[in-house]
């Protein structure tokens, strides 16, 4: 391309469809491990800061992760208004628990992640993301299979956040996007509680995966709302699903949300506020149409398998 200059010698190419690749230039590899569960890179990029890559798929980059994590965490906590106990499934970088700990109502956060090697690497190389949240006395970190913990625990939660890597066939997460898994979450959810699930991209070529996840959640919860937020390092907007057996207000008054955040959190937001929350709760028409026409329910016998991984070149 005339006038362009490619400055990186190393690239990570993520296959987002069978026809499309999204590429980030890498300036430095900070860590690499092939754990029992997945292949991990922590890298420095030319434009998006440090990034975590699992099985070739970008998880978070320091420049724009605040968008993803504020959109993932705060809609459910705002809906509850007085969250005290929060369960996080996944969340290896620690940014999810960082956001939860903004709330002065929080008494306990339990984070369950299957891959302790990834968590330790993130603790070492991504302090910008976790900001020492793992050291907070309210946080309990458990390295284990979430399904096994959910089968045996008697603890219950006001908020559950499912912040898992995409369910690609070779990865550890695909059983955790099924009706059986979501029913386990419902069992340990307090009355009036909320579940937030990262629910994949919502670009028109990929919206079917998001719609099928929402359909699966609707087989478990009385109320499920599709949300989305722009995520530049992913190359497209990302979807979430807010779930509850209680009502979900999709038309909050921005000034009341701003007052709640001022009273009950320590602030410091860069993405979420009352106006932004109102915006991301307005699901685009094509997404609503895809959800309305979808009847698939993912099960352990027929789990989801999102497309693709990526390569280093």
Across the structure, where does each feature detected by a protein language model lie?
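The AdoMet/dcAdoMet-binding core of the Class I SAM-like
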Residues: 2-13, 60-194, 204-214, 311-313
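A general beta-strand register signal
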Residues: 53-54
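Short catalytic-loop micro-motif centered on adjacent basic/acidic residues
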Residues: 88, 196-198, 226
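Short strand-turn motif at the edge of the Rossmann-like AdoMet-binding core
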Residues: 165, 198-202, 229
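Conserved Class I S-adenosyl-L-methionine
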Residues: 182-183, 208-231, 241
């Amino acid at each position: 391309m005339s006038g362009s200059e490619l400055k990186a010698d190393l690239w990570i190419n993520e296959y987002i469809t069978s026809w499309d690749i999204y590429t980030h230039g890498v300036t430095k590899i900070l860590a690499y491990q092939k754990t029992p569960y997945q292949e991990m890179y922590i890298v420095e990029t030319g434009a998006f800061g440090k990034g975590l890559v699992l099985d070739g798929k970008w998880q978070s980059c320091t420049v724009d992760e605040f968008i993803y994590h504020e959109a993932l965490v705060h809609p459910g906590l705002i809906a509850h208004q007085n969250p005290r106990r929060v369960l996080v499934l996944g969340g290896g970088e620690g940014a999810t628990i960082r956001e939860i700990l903004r709330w002065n109502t929080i008494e306990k956060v339990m984070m369950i992640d299957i891959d302790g090697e990834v968590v330790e690497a993130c603790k070492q190389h991504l302090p910008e993301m976790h900001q020492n949240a793992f050291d907070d006395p309210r946080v309990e970190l458990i390295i284990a299979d979430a399904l096994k913990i959910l089968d045996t625990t008697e603890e219950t939660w006001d908020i559950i956040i499912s912040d898992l890597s995409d369910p690609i066939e070779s990865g550890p997460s695909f059983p955790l996007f099924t009706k059986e898994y979501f029913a386990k979450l419902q069992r340990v959810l307090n009355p009036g509680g909320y579940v937030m699930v990262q629910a994949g991209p919502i670009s028109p070529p990929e919206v079917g995966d998001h719609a099928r996840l929402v359909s699966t959640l609707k087989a478990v919860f009385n109320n499920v709302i599709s949300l989305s937020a722009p995520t530049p390092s992913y190359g497209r907007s990302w979807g979430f699903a807010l779930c509850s057996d209680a009502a979900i207000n999709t038309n909050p008054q921005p000034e009341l949300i701003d007052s709640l955040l001022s009273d009950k959190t320590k602030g410091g937001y860069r993405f979420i506020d009352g106006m932004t929350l109102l915006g991301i709760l307005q699901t685009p028409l094509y997404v609503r149409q895809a959800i309305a026409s979808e009847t698939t329910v993912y099960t352990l016998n027929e789990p989801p398998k999102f497309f693709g991984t990526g390569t280093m070149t």
